[in-house]
Amino acid sequence: MAFFLLLIVSLLTCIGQVCQKQAVVSWQNNSTTKARKTIFWLITAIAMLGFGMLFWLRLLQILPLSIAYPMLSINFIVVTLIGQFIYKETVNVKHWVGIASIMLGIVLMSMQS
């Protein structure tokens, strides 16, 4: 149950972040529907982050904060991949070393002691 909730929280918060990025992209566009598109993406971002918070509150009833919060570091990995492959952002070697360090930390924290 905890893993499922963590997955939902992570997905919703990542989607919320991507919607915020899309709002910025829409705002920079010079189309006549710029404001409407931007508002759509901002409202969608707020909704995704709000639903993510509700699932997060449920997750905190199951897992200690000291375990649950670091597990959300997976979001750094997901958002970096989305930035690179969807928005064609450049990710340098230092960034990938940081991502690998985060992944190692997640693995270490998820291991039973």
Swiss-Prot record:
GO CC term (a single one): plasma membrane
Bilayer topology annotation: Multi-pass membrane protein
Every EamA domain range: 42-111
Keywords, comma-separated and alphabetical: Cell inner membrane, Cell membrane, Lipid A biosynthesis, Lipid biosynthesis, Lipid metabolism, Lipopolysaccharide biosynthesis, Membrane, Transmembrane, Transmembrane helix, Transport
InterPro entries: EamA_dom, Flippase_ArnE, Small_drug/metabolite_transptr
Keyword Repeat part of the UniProt annotation: no
Superkingdom classification of source: Bacteria
GO terms under biological process: lipid A biosynthetic process; lipopolysaccharide biosynthetic process
Similarity field: Belongs to the ArnE family.
Annotated protein name in UniProt: Probable 4-amino-4-deoxy-L-arabinose-phosphoundecaprenol flippase subunit ArnE
